[in-house]
């Protein structure tokens, strides 16, 4: 048996090492390309994922900024609406107070007018009663004076008209 086929001989191991080396060189170049291509594909995939993550992060940041701006605008509008409502409440309160004071003043004037009318009516009634009483007294006094004397029909008529003229 030749020496390079006997595993006990050094030539065998030198030949085996040479074949392994040549296999690595020959197949390693092809394997290197395949490994490099696989690594490049993996790197491209990772880079695409990183780019997508960066794009999503930027989009999320823009959305967050937009939402924060909308929230700030909504808060500003709410404060503005609250201030407007407070002003309107003060205006309504002032208007209601003015209307109430006006109604109270109008009712006070009406009450004063009613009191003045009642006073005038009472004074007129007292005056009428006094005139009626005076007419009756005058009629009574004249009737007593004229009873002894001859009663003149003209005097009787004048006494009868006296009550209506005093009123």
Swiss-Prot record:
Major location category of this protein: membrane
Domain of life: Bacteria
Membrane topology: Single-pass membrane protein
Gene Ontology molecular function: any one: proton-transporting ATP synthase activity, rotational mechanism
Key words, A-Z: ATP synthesis, Cell inner membrane, Cell membrane, CF(0), Hydrogen ion transport, Ion transport, Membrane, Transmembrane, Transmembrane helix, Transport
Subcellular location: Cell inner membrane
Pfam families linked to this entry: ATP-synt_B (PF00430)
GO cellular component, as recorded: plasma membrane; proton-transporting ATP synthase complex
Assembly description: F-type ATPases have 2 components, F(1) - the catalytic core - and F(0) - the membrane proton channel. F(1) has five subunits: alpha(3), beta(3), gamma(1), delta(1), epsilon(1). F(0) has three main subunits: a(1), b(2) and c(10-14). The alpha and beta chains form an alternating ring which encloses part of the gamma chain. F(1) is attached to F(0) by a central stalk formed by the gamma and epsilon chains, while a peripheral stalk is formed by the delta and b chains.
Family: Belongs to the ATPase B chain family.
Biological function: F(1)F(0) ATP synthase produces ATP from ADP in the presence of a proton or sodium gradient. F-type ATPases consist of two structural domains, F(1) containing the extramembraneous catalytic core and F(0) containing the membrane proton channel, linked together by a central stalk and a peripheral stalk. During catalysis, ATP synthesis in the catalytic domain of F(1) is coupled via a rotary mechanism of the central stalk subunits to proton translocation. Component of the F(0) channel, it forms part of the peripheral stalk, linking F(1) to F(0).
Protein known as: ATP synthase subunit b
Gene: atpF
């Amino acid at each position: 048996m030749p020496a390079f086929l006997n595993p006990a001989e050094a030539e065998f191991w030198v030949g085996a090492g040479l074949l392994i080396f040549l296999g690595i060189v020959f197949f390693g170049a092809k394997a290197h390309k395949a490994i490099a291509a696989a690594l490049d594909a993996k790197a491209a995939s990772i880079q695409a994922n990183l780019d997508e993550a960066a794009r999503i992060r930027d989009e999320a940041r823009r959305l967050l900024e937009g939402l924060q701006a909308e929230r700030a605008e909504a808060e500003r509008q709410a404060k503005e609406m609250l201030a407007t409502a407070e002003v309107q409440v003060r205006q309504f309160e002032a208007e209601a107070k003015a209307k109430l004071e006006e109604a109270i003043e109008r009712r006070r004037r009406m009450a004063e007018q009613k009191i003045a009318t009642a006073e005038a009516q009472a004074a007129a009634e007292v005056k009428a009663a006094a005139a009626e009483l005076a007419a009756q007294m005058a009629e009574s006094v004249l009737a007593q004076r004229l009873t002894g004397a001859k009663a003149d029909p003209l005097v009787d008529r004048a006494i009868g008209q006296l009550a209506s003229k005093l009123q």
